[in-house]
């Protein structure tokens, strides 16, 4: 597969006989929602050196063992396969002892195994998983299946470890890292705008930047597979950074190992805070220093921190879909096998529909960028209907046309909420993106009488007032829903924790809207009379506004019980366009609309979102 992610849409179009849309439709035929094969992970092969006498000279033997499905107490190792500038390339000094008693030389570089074994021994970890040794690389089928589900190993491990190779060579570099990780370089400002500020001089900030830049130049930050490995470990990843033995270890260092051991999540969070603080006040005067700061931010960004403070550096992606950011960051890195990028993206984004590389090749699809675009769309990611023509690459198109007007109903777990916001049951056709859901129209404005401050402090009281008002508005089913919710009873269609969380957040948003004196709208399914939905008066919502909603349980697709895909949920204000074929409504996305609605499966209908102009050109 060709790595054409740097080619423009125009170039992609001119190099093929068929249109981009017809290519996307053809790629769709190579998609599958069947569950991934986890048989090779049921008993996970790991390496253990615990049976070796610690007084024995030389390197220990490594025993290939098997862990049960429930065992999570192992280290999952993330490292660069290829040669690195700062490491000895020798391997084979370690012996791997198989279950049969036969032995073979280890393929992983000796220096990597030296550091890993010393680290896990210091932490009391009995075994570790490393792909080059624990997956049969000669078995193409096993390797392919493992590739599609590699994320599960890193999610499962309690002790994921990233092995970097560029060493710290000066004491002040370690000192800078200590101050960074303890939050001594930048801090949050508790004002109504939500800002960060720098706590050190410009000259000290420049020294810290050089330390961060050195760490970011490690090849560990350049691989697509490693992006997945770190991303899927969530908050558990520890980084091993080599350092000169003469450097004095500080509080952040483990005295039992030669490496500097730091928390990857904390490092990203503090590095992002520091870089935003520096960029926002133009700390660095030289063009090179400003480039280095942006370079660090691109490679070590914290998505949560960037969402909170990105406005300070003119980052416009606050309400951009998470998958768009993830895809852009993956494509900044490299992969020796370009088609691996499809599995990496699917694993990181929790996609239920995957593309079969062999089928793509058989269908004559060679374009990685169009395969990524198809994967993005067929998994329900929302595109804006825009007449704006994109002259850039496929990634530029996704950034430009990806829906960016999400409005999460609560302050907590906003990125998780946005990650669930996807369309359901996608089918691509010449006219556009076909999906299923419910079409509502706002028919009645209701505003509850003002409540006392004591009443507003009690959410239960507010819910009771809402339920009473719904009863007087001929919305009996909604009234019953809110009364049941007060008793802890959720609607039956919420069969998964993900959708229950969404419902809780939406009810909370309605309660807060009532407390704030906002209008709320009762909505009816188009063609029906009874109000079955409430939406909050936000943005441009008015009487007569059309709202499209849909949901899909993660367990509506065939999959293994240990790795759930994400529930899908959308609630969008749309424009309905007149079309000759009235049986299939044509909708155009406008805004997000928070609210609660009661679906009836019999009323779900197919709709079509037309292709953006850039793809139709």
Predicted regions and their residues:
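Short helix/strand-capping turn motifs
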Residues: 254, 261-262, 266-484
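Long mid-to-C-terminal assembly/interaction modules of large eukaryotic proteins
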Residues: 418-419, 424-617
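Residues in intrinsically disordered, low-complexity segments of regulatory proteins
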Residues: 80, 128, 219-220, 224, ...
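Metal-dependent phosphate/diphosphate-handling catalytic cores characterized by acidic Asp/Glu clusters
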Residues: 1-127, 134-145, 152, 157, ...
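Non-membrane alpha-helical secondary structure
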Residues: 4, 12-19, 149, 173, ...
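Metal-ion-coordinating, acidic/His-rich active-site neighborhoods
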Residues: 100-106, 142-150, 155-358
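Short alpha-helical segments and helix-capping/turn motifs at coil-helix boundaries
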Residues: 56-64, 113-114, 145-148, 211-213, ...
């Amino acid at each position: 597969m060709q790595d054409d992610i740097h080619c423009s849409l125009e170039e992609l179009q001119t190099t093929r006989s068929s249109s981009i849309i017809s290519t996307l439709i053809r790629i769709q035929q190579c998609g599958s929602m069947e569950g991934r094969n986890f048989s090779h992970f049921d008993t996970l092969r790991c390496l253990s050196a615990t049976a070796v006498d610690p007084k024995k000279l030389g390197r220990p033997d490594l025993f290939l063992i098997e862990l049960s499905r429930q065992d999570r107490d192992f280290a999952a190792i993330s490292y660069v396969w290829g040669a690195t500038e700062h490491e000895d390339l020798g391997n084979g000094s370690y012996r791997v002892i198989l279950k049969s008693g036969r032995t073979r030389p280890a393929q992983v570089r000796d220096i990597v195994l030296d550091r890993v074994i010393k680290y896990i021994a210091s932490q009391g970890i009995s075994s570790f998983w490393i792909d080059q040794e624990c997956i049969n690389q000669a078995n193409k089928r096993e390797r392919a299946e493992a590739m599609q589900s590699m994320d599960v190993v890193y999610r499962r491990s309690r002790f994921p470890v990233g092995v970097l190779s560029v060493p710290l060579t000066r004491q002040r570099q370690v000192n800078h890292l200590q101050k960074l990780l303890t939050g001594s370089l930048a801090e949050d400002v508790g004002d109504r705008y939500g800002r960060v500020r720098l706590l050190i001089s410009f000259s000290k900030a420049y020294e810290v930047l050089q330390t961060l830049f050195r760490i970011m130049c490690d090849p560990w930050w350049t691989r697509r597979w490693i992006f997945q490995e770190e991303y899927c470990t969530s908050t558990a990843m520890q980084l091993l950074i080599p350092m000169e033995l003469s450097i004095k270890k500080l509080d952040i260092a483990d005295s039992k190992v030669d490496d500097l051991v730091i928390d990857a999540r904390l490092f990203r969070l503090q590095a992002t805070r520091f870089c935003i603080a520096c960029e926002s006040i133009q700390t660095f005067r030289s063009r090179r220093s400003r480039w280095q700061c942006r370079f660090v931010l691109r490679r070590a960004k914290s998505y949560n921190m960037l969402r909170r403070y990105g406005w300070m550096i003119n980052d416009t992606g606050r309400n951009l879909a998470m998958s768009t950011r993830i895809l852009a960051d993956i494509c900044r890195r490299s992969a020796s096998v370009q088609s691996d990028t499809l599995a990496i993206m699917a694993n990181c984004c929790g996609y239920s529909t995957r593309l079969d590389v062999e089928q793509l090749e058989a269908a004559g699809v060679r374009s990685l960028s169009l395969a990524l675009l198809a994967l993005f769309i067929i998994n329900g990611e929302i595109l804006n209907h825009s007449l704006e023509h994109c002259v850039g690459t496929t990634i530029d198109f996704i950034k430009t046309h990806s829906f960016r007007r999400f409005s999460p109903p609560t302050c907590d777990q906003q990125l998780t909420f946005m990650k669930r916001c996807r369309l359901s049951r996608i089918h691509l056709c010449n006219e556009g993106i076909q999906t299923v859901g419910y079409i509502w129209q706002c028919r009645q404005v209701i505003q509850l009488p003002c409540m006392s401050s004591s009443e507003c402090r009690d959410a239960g009281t507010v819910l009771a007032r809402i339920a009473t008002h719904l009863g007087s508005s001929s919305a009996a089913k909604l009234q019953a829903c809110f009364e049941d919710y007060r008793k802890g009873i959720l609607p039956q269609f919420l069969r998964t924790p993900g959708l229950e969380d969404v419902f809780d957040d939406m009810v909370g948003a309605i309660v807060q809207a009532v407390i704030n004196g906002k209008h709320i709208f009762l909505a009816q399914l188009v063609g029906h009379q009874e109000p079955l939905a409430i939406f909050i008066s936000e943005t441009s919502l008015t009487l007569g506004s059309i709202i499209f909603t849909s949901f899909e349980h993660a367990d509506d697709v065939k999959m293994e019980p240990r790795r759930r895909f994400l529930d899908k949920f959308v609630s969008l204000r749309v424009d309905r366009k007149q079309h000759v074929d009235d049986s299939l409504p044509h909708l155009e996305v406008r805004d997000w609309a928070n609210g609660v609605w009661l679906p009836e499966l019999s009323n779900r209908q197919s709709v079509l979102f037309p292709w953006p102009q850039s793809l139709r050109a």
